[in-house]
Amino acid sequence: MEGYFTTDLEDRQKILSEFESNKNSNIELYLGNEIFLTSNLTELLKEKKAIPLNNTKYILFELPFNIKPMNINDMIFEIQSNGLVPILAHPERYSYFYKNPENYEEFVDKGVLLQLNFGSFDGQYGSRAKLMAEKLLKSNLAHFIATDVHRPNTLYPRIPRIIKNLNELVGDEKINKLTNINPNLLLQNKDIEIEKFSHIKWNLFEKMKMNKK
C-alpha cells in the first residue's frame, strides 16, 4: 500500500540500542515489522524499508480487513521464493474468510504460519473473531498467540486470565508452545513444526453467526 510504510528503521534501531544500554529490567526487545502485504513487499525488504522479525527468516504480515486481496497466493509464493517464512497476523479478524474456513487450511498447507491475538479470545474484536480464534486453536491451525499491542493499553492486565481460560480450553502444554516455545524458536531462526490439523466445522448456530454481514 502506497505510503503505508512510514517507520524509519534506523531511528527504531537507535531507540532500541539506547533502551538496551539504559534499561534496568530483564525485558528483551527485538526489532521487527508487522508488514502490510503488498505486491512490492520483496522490494521493500531488499531496500530495508521493511524487515523480518529479529533479522530471521520469519516475516509477519497482515491483510486488509475489508477486502480479500485477489493475488494473495502469488504474493505469499514470492515471499517464500526469497527464503522467507510468512506469518499471517490475526487471521481470526478477517471476516471474508469466515464463510470458507478452508482458506486457513490452505494457508497452512502452503507453509504459512498463523498468529492469533490474545485480545480475540477476550472478545476485544467481537464475538465472531473470538469464535474464529477458538476454532483455529482447537483445530491446530495456530502457531503463535501474541498481544498485537502497538501502544500502551489495557490488554496486559488481562493476559493472565486469558491464558488461564486458554489452558482450560486446550491444555497448558499447547498454550506454552504457542506463547513460549514457538516464539523462542523464531527468535533463534529455527524451524517451527506445522502439526497435523483438523477441519473447521460449524454447527447451525455458528454458521448463521459467521455468515452474517
Which stretches of residues belong to each language-model region?
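Conserved, mostly hydrophobic/aromatic
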Residues: 90, 148, 183
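Short active-site-adjacent structural elements
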Residues: 123-125, 153-157, 187
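Short acidic/histidine-rich active-site segments
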Residues: 141-157
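Short loop-to-alpha-helix "cap/lid" segments that border enzyme active sites
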Residues: 126-132
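Short acidic, glycine/proline-enriched helix-loop-strand junctions
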Residues: 6-9, 25-28, 154-182
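Short, conserved active-site loops that position catalytic residues or coordinate cofactors/metal ions
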Residues: 1-2
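Mid-to-C-terminal alpha-helical segments outside catalytic/metal-binding sites
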Residues: 164-213
